[in-house]
């Protein structure tokens, strides 16, 4: 199949599946995705200066890919109080961050009102320094908080927005297929609940990212269905700011240790995800992020020539990928990020969470 035909023609699910399965045309595919990237966003590659605040690892969930969670009485369990979260946000602001990404495990005492207190405290603490964008709470956290507070999803999202939620990570998507989810994350929200929460957030004017975690127990057909669900949501709401493929970190994941999951995706599969998603999301989601935490510097540089146009954040403290066995560090300086981009002939630019260029 010649990928170039998708310059004019919309790709079907069947054709997307063929592109994932065909190893004879990978270089044509990557070259075509790179040309689409150039048409949509030019040669600018963006990054955000941000800090991740994972405020607790205590979690009642039982996701079988997660090596981050702890029970309340585990030795390594921790829970940052609201003052500590606010203090870290102020440190981030003083450091030059424009965003804090706040997420945590599903701690039994957390509800929507507690999440709202976190938002309020962070905005109040950072206001004297010019305030900070809060990117927080996955659809799973929103669902869990609402349930604990006895609220419906709409009410919960309204409260979070009123208290300063600026945008949401579209994590907890993993693979949007209930058979896969039953095996991978049995306690997590179902596909239709994830879709509903994302759409409600978009309707309220809360932009979100979209993600896909791949390389574990799923097949290519699941990737295709997942990507088309995201495409259909974007056609309806236009609320996704970016798509972030998340390559499965297998090393310490329980499901891998039990011998039930692959050892992550191959390098070629990683690159195919960038390329095919660039084709599927043509004209809909123009920002596709290659995560250096998951892929490492060199692989990100290749991804930037296969459809990706963003490298994510400086991410001071990325404890979730680290506990899963990511080997690429938890912080990259702005100088390193810019150098990584420049060395593949592209132009680095700092952006905000919502993709406003800052230079």
From Swiss-Prot:
InterPro entries: Aldolase_TIM, CofH/MnqC-like_C, CofH_family, Elp3/MiaA/NifB-like_rSAM, F420, FO_synthase_su2, rSAM
Pathway: Cofactor biosynthesis; coenzyme F0 biosynthesis
Positions contributing to [4Fe-4S] cluster binding: 59, 63, 66
Domain of life of the organism encoding this protein: Archaea
GO-annotated molecular function: 4 iron, 4 sulfur cluster binding; 5-amino-6-(D-ribitylamino)uracil--L-tyrosine 4-hydroxyphenyl transferase activity; 7,8-didemethyl-8-hydroxy-5-deazariboflavin synthase activity; iron ion binding
Cofactor-binding details, from the entry: Binds 1 [4Fe-4S] cluster. The cluster is coordinated with 3 cysteines and an exchangeable S-adenosyl-L-methionine.
Keyword Transferase recorded: yes
Catalysed reaction equations from the record: 5-amino-6-(D-ribitylamino)uracil + L-tyrosine + S-adenosyl-L-methionine = 5-amino-5-(4-hydroxybenzyl)-6-(D-ribitylimino)-5,6-dihydrouracil + 2-iminoacetate + 5'-deoxyadenosine + L-methionine + H(+)
Requisite cofactors: [4Fe-4S] cluster
Known EC number: 2.5.1.147
Keywords from the UniProt entry: 4Fe-4S, Iron, Iron-sulfur, Metal-binding, S-adenosyl-L-methionine, Transferase
Gene3D superfamilies from the UniProt entry: Aldolase class I (3.20.20.70)
Domain Radical SAM core: residue ranges: 45-278
Keyword Metal-binding: yes
Function: Catalyzes the radical-mediated synthesis of 5-amino-5-(4-hydroxybenzyl)-6-(D-ribitylimino)-5,6-dihydrouracil from 5-amino-6-(D-ribitylamino)uracil and L-tyrosine.
Family the UniProt entry places it in: Belongs to the radical SAM superfamily. CofH family.
Subunit and partners: Consists of two subunits, CofG and CofH.
Name used for this protein in its record: 5-amino-6-(D-ribitylamino)uracil--L-tyrosine 4-hydroxyphenyl transferase
